[in-house]
Amino acid sequence: YVLEEYGEPAKVYFYENPFVKMSRRWYAGQKPFYKPPEFPYNYKLKYTSHHLSHAAYGYYTSPFDNTMVLVIDAIGEWETLTVWKAKGKKLKKLWNWKYPKSLGLMYSALTQYAGWKPNEEEYIMMGAAARQTYPYEPVYNRILNLWNNDTSWHRGLSKVEAWKERPEVHPEDVPTAAQAVYEKIFRDIIKEVSNHKLNETGNIIFVGGCALNVSANRF
């Protein structure tokens, strides 16, 4: 339909840069690999950054022409959080977090510890968080302390595996505590973006995998 309606595309962009991504995999001790995207057409392919793809999607499909854009996910190539100023046709990146510091990786590691599949079943943990009215304080404090003092959540389950030796930390207590820590960090981020000197309108577009955490989006 698109080809019939608009004709042949002038450019085709891929949503991330696999070569930059490979450098991060080398850094993390993972085996780098690259498989070119397969297209049925002979178009010249251009790569863009993962977070720029998120930001562009959020802004250019929105009703705003002057706004801040916040992107948070587990990880792009290296970036895990980016903040952008969008005005007119332009997107300008203001600041970022880079791997291994990642709010999304923290949530995924805790999802795995609680017994669900990381990078897929975080929505189940988000729902399970509602079972308790308040987080179990020792677990909440342990997660928050880890976030404040050690950003190596890329180690995944091994990050929190030692908790199994501690009787005060049970997997069933993790969802509510993890959600509470996530929301605390998220509120701080939103406050910083809202108060940024370039936020002229008060608008914020939030995109990326963490935007699916609808419980936190009420802020």
Q: Where are the model-predicted features located?
A:
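A short helix-loop
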Residues: 68-172, 218-219
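Short acidic-aromatic active-site loops that bind/stabilize oxyanions
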Residues: 45-48, 168-184
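Conserved phosphate-binding catalytic cores of ATP/NTP-utilizing and phosphoryl-transfer enzymes
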Residues: 47-70
